[in-house]
Amino acid sequence: MRPGEESHLVPKEIENAADEPRVLCIVQDTTSCKNINERITLNLPASTSVKQLYEDVSSKAGYVSGTFSLMWGNGASNMVDMAALDPTPDRTLQEAGFEAGKKNFLHLTDKNGEQPQLASDESGTADSSGLDDSTQEKFIGPLPREESVACTSDYVSQNYSYSSLLSKSDTGYVGLVNQAMTCYLNSLLQTLFMTPEFRNALYKWEFEESEEDPVSSIPYQLQRLFVLLQTSKKRAIETTDVTRSFGWDSSEAWQQHDVQELCRVMFDALEQKWKQTEQADLINQLYQGKLKDYVKCLECGYESWRIDTFLDIPLVIRPFGSNTAFGSMEEALQAFIQPETLDGPNQYFCERCKRKCDARKGLKFLHFPYLLTLQLKRFDFDYTSMHRIKLNDRMTFPDELDMSPFIDVEDEKSPQTDSCTDSGAENEGSCHSDQMSNDFSTDDAVDEGICLETNSNIEKLNKSVSEKNSLYELFSVMVHSGSAAGGHYYACIKSFADGQWYSFNDQHVSRITQEDIKKTYGGSTGNRGYYSSAFASSTNAYMLMYRLKNPARNAKFPEAIEFPEHIKLLVQKEQEQEEQEKRQREIERNTCKLKLFCMHPVKQIMMESKLEVHKDKTMKEAVEIAHKLMDLEGVISLDCCRLVKYDEFHDYLERSYEDEEDRTMGYLLGGVKSSYMFDLLLETKRSDQVFQSYKPGEVMVKVYVVDLKTETVAPPVSVRAYLSQTIIEFKQLISKSVDLLPDTMRVVLERCYNDLRLLNVANKTLKAEGFFRSNKVFVESSDSLDYQLVFTDSHLWKLLDRHANTIRLYVSLPEHTPQTARSVGPKGGGDSNLSEDYCSRVKGNVKSVDAILEESTEKLKSLSLQQHQDGGNGDSSKSTEGSDFENIDSPLNEADSGSADNRELENRILPADPENNFQPEERSDSDVNNDRSTSSVDSDILSSSHSSDTLCNADSAPIPLANGLDSHSITSSRRSKANDGKKETWDTAEEDSGTDSEYDESGKSRGEAQYMYFKAEPHAGEGCLGEGNKCLLVSVDKRITLAAFKQQLESFVGVSSSQFKVFRVYASNQEFESVRLNETLSSFSDDNKITIRLGRALKKGEYRVKIFQLLVNEPEPCKFLLDAVFSKGMTVRQSKEELLPLLRDQCGLDLSIDRFRLRKKTWKNPGTVFLDYHVYENESISSSWEVFLEALDETEKMKSMSQLSLFTKRWRPSELKLDPFKEIVMESNSVDELRDKICDISAIPLENLEFAKGRGTFPCDISVLEIHQDLDWNPKVSTLNAWPLYISDDGAVIFYRDKMEELVELTDEQRNDLAKKESSRLQKTGHRVTYSPRKEKALKIYLDGPSNKDSSQD
């Protein structure tokens, strides 16, 4: 809510209307006359006439009466065809059908296809700030008696309509649109505009376009803005052109700054732009004053001084260290010039006395500017809470201010003065500079922006001092509402034209009174202001502007006829541009905008565009526009196209427009609307065809012909029918379109997903069967016996059920490198294409599977193999006769998937051979030990692979296993003895870990054998990810599980399903791994993209872990080693055992199991040491698990969780260097023990030892120039877990030193060289630690335009 405005208008109640029933009317404006959809609520007596209702709506909506219609909106399905309320008969609302005590919904619509006429033709741009009160509901009638939101003004407009929101305020002034947080800019611009002297000078300046770009010219854009503020008929205008001339981009609009800060920066920019022009000294002439900064010796009377200039005077609200604020601005001014005594340690060195003496230091005003600017310093720093605060104390200020008491009139008479070159004054330094100082300075009498004048002219100063007129008149109060964290600025400005005060609050301009000015004094007294309760007391004056009362100098605002010629030309140019915008808005207001669709006659793809056509264009002309818009010129002739009414959501053709080619679009579409409930379709035909007539009431039916023999469903054929038709009539209609016999035709309606209904009652109507606007039916006509079966048992139903659940997926396969090929091919094979000899050798060994399985089971005591398939051929790709499953041969090899699985597993279990060793990048988590017997299978190895479907006999022949073998039952004897002979199952999915599912003998997930439709074929082109990748187009039943889907892909990928991962690709090309094997593909949809990546898929309870090596004394202490797989329930020692061969083969680290440790990794910090007996189930693990591996020089010292491992590093100040890290293990958290441990490893006497905790991330690096002073040495604590140490976990860094060792002294040159080296070192390692909070972005105006913005940055 803005001051002086209220969108809820409440007229006085009629006294005798209390007992009369009232009618609540809610009117929704559905026209497109306005940029917003207005909603008006009227609470009228039931005896009100319909004619009066029209009058009330026209008054409140801002339309001319009689140019719009009101229609019922209570659930009307087709509003356009309903008759409007007739206002001519003298009927009351009750007689017209309005119900008292209920909501009566009405729609305000176009009348006879013509839009309503606005009551005011003078319309401006819509408020782009999003704060327009017109978006609120307007209410007429009695409201509950609640206290309304208070305004800062007693003035409330009684003629408030929509047109007034867009037209110029009745105050005669134009507002400024708030871009986002530019209210501080708006308040200053309005103040400058309302300053006659500034406006007149700006108008006198003439822009030379040949010399400068108008876009980057600040004076020109200000000139344009002022011209628009004076001559525009809009309610508010934009400031984007001005901010663009500042060199600001759109992000600057979201930065809030102080208005006083902006004033200084803008004045500096104008001075730079106005150099060598008539306005070069304008800012100084209007706003600059002078004061004297002096120091006077109290013993000899000698005074040294210098002259400063100022553009504004900063006044402290509350003195530093005081709890009491100044009550008035006069008190603050007196405090500003009140001298302070320099005594004690602050004595002043007097040049005459040649010694330090007591002195008096202060400021004296010598000359006040014509326009006096006073800043009330309401922002301060609270040293108790260490936060910036706003002081909301009450401070009064007069309407007229006499500044004569504050001028030093006796200064020129003082003989004992000296220039500002005095050394004492230089040592003290001026408290005023042209650089911005910190608002949190302890010297609150000091401010920013007062600049030093080194070449002062004494004669001019004496002349200015002699001027007696020092009476100023207040004309601008810039107000801040909010807190130190942020708020809102607006300006209260007194017009010199009529003496009336106005509130300029962004786009809102309203009249206010002197009482409203008093409310800006601050404090908690008085009525609430602009903000409600939360900021009621925080609305107060922040910046004041006074003008000298001098009739000889006081200027008046220029009238239009007094404008200079170049301003008149600018006014004419802006008015023409505004008229052009107005005409464009009028065109927009009469333009129908709809979605346009068209099925391309050649490409057969649905195209979509946006059709914009004037309401007076005919249908024939609209077809020509649509024809060009869809780029069909040269593709199809214009006479083979037409526009029809279309419902894209239901894919339904509602009606065609025969014999209406000469009707206007406004008439056919029901007028111009902001949105339509329908679309348009550009329908095409062949030259030998005739357009079909579409009439309202028809329903669209898409007919799919099913062929049971080929099990195919043909593309749809569109048929239009009537809901009153019977099923037998509907079949006859279909037979004409698809050439099927109606007697044997079966028609199945799909009402919704998976809802198939056989239409077999001949005399039942389509309406009774549940047909709607758009329908989908399947038809089949054959003489097969399938017709006699129950529908749900028939082949037709199964085929349709499969069709409804089949989705199409694009699957990108991994590229097989030579290393990868060795993992899936025969021994020593380096080619990804497997030889046919090898394939036949595999198939030849299938017969002996039972015997070899029995032999292998005897050797593996801890295994229990579950075999569910007789014969053991392992062919998971074959199905029983009659199944819906269809498998396409792999493009990689022609063998079946079972053979591929066997080949892959044979190679994985073949005897170890130097020529067949895994390379680091090709190794899985399984490993074959060379010292094991080749005639048996090590259970430990199999347990880590989880992928073996093949065993090997002593002759190294491959032994294919039945796919029913659950590889998870092959477990390590040390972990799963309790499960010996039992099959492990993983029924429940667990977040962030792998899952598994049970398979039946055909390789399918149990209970889903009937949902195994799978068809894959090579694909190239659209849908494939990346160039060169092999891609499949897969049609699959989405009810199968991910596990079954992966099994079907095995033959195409070339490895077992446990050795590759499935990633789902989203629109933004983000990939997420699908790991829940027992979940179906129901979350996938048509044309989804899938990427297959090689790598062992996780099982339930398993987690992928990134292993990093901790190198404490290296420049980069964190080095990635490898990815490993840990599982819950595994001990730390077991994981170390599994890591040993991986570290040796992949990383070249030959470690002893007792000479390295694992520890927690948090970002780059080493944490808790994992002891060997720890179980990972007790640790907090997730999908992004990272662990440090730390090599040890000796056996592990950490034996218990009660111990604490710390890193210590000695600082040697005499050498400016740090020793390497040394680890100490604490038995307790005692500081005394820490001291003792450090003394033991350093030989420093206990009484000379000092220590400090490192800062930042490990290794807590710090510059050797800073460590001696910046760290908190020798904290006074007794335990490590107390402040400021807070050490309670392993891995903390402790620096220590010998306090008797003195810091080496460096020359300036040595220090600079060392500083450069340290800076370079810390930047390379990335361990530079800074603790400065986020700084506010400085307000800058870039004089060279946006292009040079970056170079202007500090």
From Swiss-Prot:
Q: Which Pfam families match?
A: UCH, USP47_C
GO terms (BP aspect): base-excision repair; DNA damage response; monoubiquitinated protein deubiquitination; proteolysis
Catalysis performed (reactions): Thiol-dependent hydrolysis of ester, thioester, amide, peptide and isopeptide bonds formed by the C-terminal Gly of ubiquitin (a 76-residue protein attached to proteins as an intracellular targeting signal)
- Identify the main location: cytoplasm
SUPFAM superfamilies to which the protein is assigned, alphabetical:
Cysteine proteinases
Please tell me which top-level EC class this enzyme sits in. hydrolase
Indicate, by first and last residue, each region the UniProt record lists as having compositional bias (Basic and acidic residues).
920-930, 977-986
**Active site positions:** 183 (nucleophile), 488 (proton acceptor)
Bias (Polar residues) ranges: 114-133, 416-438, 863-882
Question: Low complexity: which segments have biased composition?
Answer: 933-949
Xref: InterPro entries: Papain-like_cys_pep_sf (IPR038765), Peptidase_C19 (IPR050164), Peptidase_C19_UCH (IPR001394), USP47_C (IPR045578), USP_CS (IPR018200), USP_dom (IPR028889)
State whether keyword Ribosomal protein applies.
no
Q: Name the EC number(s).
A: 3.4.19.12
- Region (Disordered) residue ranges read 114-139, 408-438, 863-1004, 1314-1335
Compartments, as annotated in UniProt: Cytoplasm
Query: What does the UniProt function comment say about this protein?
Result: Ubiquitin-specific protease that specifically deubiquitinates monoubiquitinated DNA polymerase beta (polb), stabilizing polb thereby playing a role in base-excision repair (BER).
Protein name per the record: Ubiquitin carboxyl-terminal hydrolase 47
